[in-house]
Every structure is written in structure tokens, then in C-alpha cells.
Amino acid sequence: MTLEKGNIAENFELLGSDGQSIILNSYKNLKNVVLCFYPKNHLFACPSKKVFEMAKSVIAVYPDIISTTTVLFAISVDSVDSQAEFVKEYEIPYVHLSDPKKIACKKYAGTNIAGLAKRSTFVVGMDGVIRDVMREINVTSHGQEILDSLNKIKV
């Protein structure tokens, strides 16, 4: 069973595309956290295009997202090296987290039959409570959907 809106966000520690270790609870009482789960980088088909389209829509509003005292992470089962390559290739301004053991992916997004994270986004308030869960993702408008969700949070 995966986490839902209203649940306390479960802590995890994952390595980022920048080589830094990210501990979710380290942001508690400091920042909202957006966790964007997606299946995998560089798939040879539609999912790869969806990853890029989703990244583009988030990048378009990223300055507005971080202005809401928020940090955003994208998470997949890819290795740190793959994440770093993907971030560099597409000039993505936010950190991608590597979850090859599927620790956060299983708790939050759940995994599909291939063992990849299901595409979903979690908005965690500064208090550590999950404020919104998006499972039906429109990749071209997802950045604005994230921003709209953040703007509803009362700090």
C-alpha cells in the first residue's frame, strides 16, 4: 500500500544526481518538498518522451515553484550516473534522486509489473504531511499543476 494525502511523509535517504545524499526529513519545518516519481530515464519509447515532456513543463515554472519555499526532486530507479547524465543532457535545474533499491518508489508511487516507479507526484508540506498526491499526470501541464497545489498550502 502506498502513501496518500494526509499521511505523514515517510523519511528516506537517497543519492542525488549531484552526488549529494538527500534525507527527506532534513527539510521538515524548513521547506515544502515535491517528489516527482517517474519510471526510468532513456527508455526507447513513449515513456522516455513523457519524462522529457514532464521535465519541460516543470522547468517552465521552476522559478515560481522554488519561490514558494519549496525544493523539488525527481525520483526513479535509475543509477546516480544515469540521473546525472539525464540532468546534464536536458539541462534540468533540479536534482534527480536515484532509488535503485526502490525504497521510496514502493512507499510513495508504487511500482509497475516491470519494477519501475509509477508516474506520480507528492507535495509534502513543511510540517511533513502529504498535502497532495497526483497520480493522473498530464505531462505537458504538470509543472503548473504542481505550482497550483503549492499555492493552496497554508504555511
For the regions a language model picked out, list residue spans one by one.
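Chalcogenol-based redox active-site neighborhoods
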Residues: 1-155
